[in-house]
């Protein structure tokens, strides 16, 4: 089994677990509430000579641990000071060691729009919030 097969397998397990916790209707309601974030993100990167979207992640399947002393709050503040126009937070638990808590913590300390990155492997809409 290669790494992509492993990621897909683990993600399917997590999606099936999530289905028993939150209904698709609840997710859709949350997405409707968050629609203003999409336009905020678009406005922040549109019509910019240089619009950097900085990524925050603790690990990756290929590099394993990227930062032993991972401090996403400090990293977000540094990126914002350096001119990033948006942040991409990896929240995937198993291979990127992210979490929704990291996303929530970073959102409290920055004014930048933050899209949630399940982009490395998104399965059903259930996992996109």
Model-inferred region functions:
Residues 2-67:
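An N-cap/entry alpha-helix motif that binds or orients negatively charged groups
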Residues 52-54, 87, 114-117:
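Hydrophobic faces of well-ordered beta-strands that scaffold small-molecule active sites
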Residues 61-63, 86-103:
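Glycine-rich, proline-tolerant flexible connector loops at the mouths of alpha/beta enzymes
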Residues 70-85:
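Alpha/beta enzyme core
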Residues 99-115:
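Alpha-helix-loop-beta-strand connector modules within alpha/beta enzyme cores
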Residues 119-125:
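Conserved small/polar residues in nucleotide/adenosyl-binding loops
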Residues 128-129:
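Short hydrophobic transmembrane-like helices used for membrane targeting/insertion
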């Amino acid at each position: 089994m290669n790494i992509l097969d492993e990621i897909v397998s683990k993600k399917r397990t997590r999606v099936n677990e999530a289905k028993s916790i939150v209904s698709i209707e609840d997710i859709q309601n949350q997405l409707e509430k968050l629609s203003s974030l999409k336009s905020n993100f678009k406005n922040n990167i549109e019509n910019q000579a240089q619009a950097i979207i900085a990524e925050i992640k603790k690990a990756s399947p290929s590099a394993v641990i990227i930062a032993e002393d991972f401090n996403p709050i400090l990293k977000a503040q540094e990126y914002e000071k350096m001119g990033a126009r948006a942040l991409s937070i990896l929240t995937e638990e198993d291979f990127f060691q992210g979490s929704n808590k990291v996303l929530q913590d970073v959102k409290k300390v920055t004014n930048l729009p933050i899209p949630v990155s399940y982009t490395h492997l998104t399965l059903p809409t259930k996992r996109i919030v």
